[in-house]
C-alpha cells in the first residue's frame, strides 16, 4: 500500500483469534479481538475523528479556517488532530490533568493546543471548559463526542461493517469497554440489526457508575463514565461487567507477554470481561471484543510495571 496521507490508513485493522491454547477458553469457542490500536493514530478513535470532520464539512458546520475544540481523555484529540492536518485546521483540546502525559504530548506533536482542567472535576469539567472556549473563540466548532450522534454513527458505518464482513453473523456476544459510549452503541446497533440474538456486554472499571456504583478514581484509562451516555437510550444491554484495575492491568501484561499485543489497559479489561463471558456460554460460542488503543501512551502510568 502506497499512501500520500496517513489519514488514508485509518480502518481495515486485523482481527486476532484467541483459543484455549493460551487462555481458559472452552472447547471450540473463541474470542475475536479487533485490533484498533493499529490505526495510524493508535486508537479506534481515528475512525471517529475522520467521521466527525467529514460530516462537519459536509453539513457546513466548519470551513478551512475553523478551530476545532473538544474535551477528551486523549485518543479523540489525537484522532481529530491527525485528521485536521489534512485540512489545515487548528485544534484545541481540553484534557483533565489525570490523563496520561504521553497522549497530551502526541496531541501537541500533531499541532494541537492542550489545555488542562483539574483532575477533581473529571471529564465534566473538561466539557464545561470546552463550551466556554467555543463561546469565546470566533469560527470555532465543538463536536462534543459525548453528545454528538455522529459518534455512534462513525462506528455503525465503518467499524461494524468491517467486522461482519470478516466474521459473518455467527457471533454469540459482543463485549466492549464503555467511555463516551459511541463505539459500543454504534457497534451494538449494527450487530443487533443483523444478529438479533447477540448478547451485548458493556465493560467498565471500578469507579464507573454503570453497575450502580458511585463514581470514583480508577487507573484504567479510556473507559468508565460519570454519567449515562445518551446513546444508550434504545439499547438493550444484557449486562455490565466491572473489572478492577488489578485485573485489567494483569491481562494487559499477559496480552503483551503471551501474544505480542502491545495494547492499553482498556484492552486488558475488555479481554478479561470477554473471558468471563465466553466461560459462561456453551462450547462453540464466538465472542467479539475491541482492543481500542496502544500501550505506548500509558508507559508513564506503569502499565507494564
Curated annotation (Swiss-Prot):
Positions with a binding annotation for pyridoxal 5'-phosphate: 75, 179-183, 266
Entry EC no(s): 2.5.1.47
Swiss-Prot/TrEMBL GO biological process terms: cysteine biosynthetic process from serine
A Pfam short name: PALP
Superkingdom: Bacteria
Pathway per the UniProt entry: Amino-acid biosynthesis; L-cysteine biosynthesis; L-cysteine from L-serine: step 2/2
Database matches in InterPro entries: Cys_Synth/Cystath_Beta-Synth (IPR050214), P-phosphate_BS (IPR001216), TrpB-like_PALP (IPR001926), TrpB-like_PALP_sf (IPR036052)
Cofactor entry: pyridoxal 5'-phosphate
Subunit (UniProt): Homodimer.
Name of the protein described by the UniProt record: Cysteine synthase
Originating gene: cysM
